Amino acid sequence: MKSAASSSSSSAGSNWKALKKTLGSDASSSSASSSTNNRRKLSTSESTKPKRTRLDAKEKDAEGSKSCSPAPTSLPWFAEDISPQDLELVRESASGKMARSGEWEGIVDAKLKKQIILGGLPSDASSAKKEPGNYLAIDCEMVGVGDKGSESILARVSIVNFHGATIYDQFVRPQEKVTDYRTWVSGVRPKDLKGAPSFSQVQGEVANLIKGKVLVGHAIQNDLKALLLSHPKVLIRDTATFQPLRDLAKTKYPSLKKLAKLVLGIDIQLEGESHSSVEDARATMAVFRSQKPKWDEMLRSQNKGGRGSLARLASRSSAANKVWKAPANGQAVDAASPALDKRSMLAFTSASAVHDTVRLKPRMAAKADWWKESM
């Protein structure tokens, strides 16, 4: 019995030793196979990697230099911290403006711009804007009479309202033989004067139209002398003598053409084109409109009595707008007249706001080109 137990224990011990050896050999073989597999994987991965060439090295250097330099951007420095949403809005707005400008390109030309500034489009003119109103601008065209057309006489009168709408436009039948129509500058042709109303008729119509109105003109004393009319100084606005416009043009006698360019940004009286008294009257009124607030303020400061006193002067002086009629003997009653004074007709006082009727010989009144010599 004892020998049987010992034999079984020795058998068990030998079995454990045999199993241990088997497990050890399996572990060593598995570790060996694992290391072998690892070496195989490593060799396989190394074999699959592309061999580095000199070109790859150069490309890597180039990439490194690119990564060091800042990324290129089309935005200015002050816009780099703007959010992408805001930038997108800006881009959309800019593209919209470019599209709209593209639509208008070639449509708004110089002629259309001039038309809009001087009187607006005919389709935009309401019936109220076609009424005479309280402000009228006047311009006259002359033709030459006498020896070689050296003297001027009235040939056309144009009057526009505050908005530039034509209120009156009439050719005048000359009182004397025309020796120079000056078509290149006046736009007047012989056919325009045939059948035109007489001077006295036009004179009376203009006198009735401007009575009690604020009369705007450029060197307006020339137009009044050509018409042989007077008008109260308190109701006159002369763009040729308004000091701020003189300062702007840097000359004592600025031409209407120069003021239109400086103030309105348009070209009038272009070379090769005949003048139009309607266009000149509209340009004069447009210049006046741009200066009206400043003009009114200057007049109020000059008139210490205030707006009420100015209105009373205007109402009293409206009766002074008279038509001169030559005496029976054909001689001028008074050759000396305030209208011949080349000083500004804007400077007025309570004593000089109302003046008498201008009395001039027709030939003297026709000499109305002195201001052109100073341009």
Curated annotation (Swiss-Prot):
GO molecular function: 3'-5' exonuclease activity; exonuclease activity; nucleic acid binding
One cellular component (GO) term of this entry: nucleus
Residues of the Exonuclease domain: 134-297
Subcellular location per the Swiss-Prot or TrEMBL entry: Nucleus
SUPFAM superfamilies: Ribonuclease H-like
Ranges annotated as biased composition (Basic and acidic residues): 53-64
Protein name, as recorded: RNA exonuclease 4
Source organism of the structure: Mycosarcoma maydis
Originating gene: REX4
